[in-house]
Regions:
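Anion-binding alpha/beta catalytic cores of soluble intermediary-metabolism enzymes, centered on
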Residues: 1-17, 21-185
């Protein structure tokens, strides 16, 4: 919660915390409790429509949207939020699976990959406002053994998300030398 509050205080985001209000210690913050939210019934109907082809009935859909991951993803899908942060208490696979089931992937995306961004403390590379440039670590665990084509697509997508081509390097991989040729891709 501290990160969300800091982002809000810095004017970087309008944060919505998802969870039980009595468990969220964030005075003045917006809190959505999926168990009591006015949005839950509508979210349950939408989620049921999305997943009924997989055998999900209305009761299971309602139970699912009362979980923080699904509720947060529904906030994004339905336009109440522009993004969601999850993973501190959920596995990467749970976060990604939920996002795919609720939000889906971009129509032009051939695959789903992941990244995380690190913002180092103030450094010579910081801008005039003291903000450091993000270091983006792409697909650190979702596409385990990418082909050269997949690796190139992941790198291009990550650079595009940052608004420029950026510079990048490829770190070591357990499969070693047979992957080194991919750097030229």
């Amino acid at each position: 919660m501290a990160g969300g509050l800091a982002a809000q205080e810095a004017g970087l985001a309008d944060v919505i915390f998802v969870g039980r209000a009595d468990h969220v210690d964030a005075p003045g913050a917006t809190v959505h409790d999926p168990a009591t939210s006015d949005l839950t019934d509508g979210f349950a109907q939408v989620f049921h429509e999305l997943r009924k082809h997989k055998g999900m009935d209305e009761a299971k859909a309602r139970a699912a949207v009362q979980t923080p991951l699904v509720y947060a993803a529904m906030l994004v899908r339905e336009g109440h939020a522009t993004g969601t942060v999850g993973g501190a208490v959920a596995t990467t696979s749970d976060v990604v699976r939920t996002a795919i089931q609720v939000i889906g992937k971009a129509p032009d995306a051939a695959m789903v990959s992941s990244f995380f961004a690190m913002y180092p403390p103030r450094s010579p590379a910081s801008d005039a406002n003291g903000l450091s440039r993000a270091m983006v670590y792409s697909d650190c665990g979702l596409v385990i053994a990418p082909s050269s084509t997949e690796l190139a697509a992941i790198a291009a997508q990550s650079a595009g998300e940052q608004g420029d081509r950026g510079s990048f390097g490829l770190a070591g991989h357990p499969s070693g030398p047979q992957r080194r040729w991919r750097i030229a891709v």
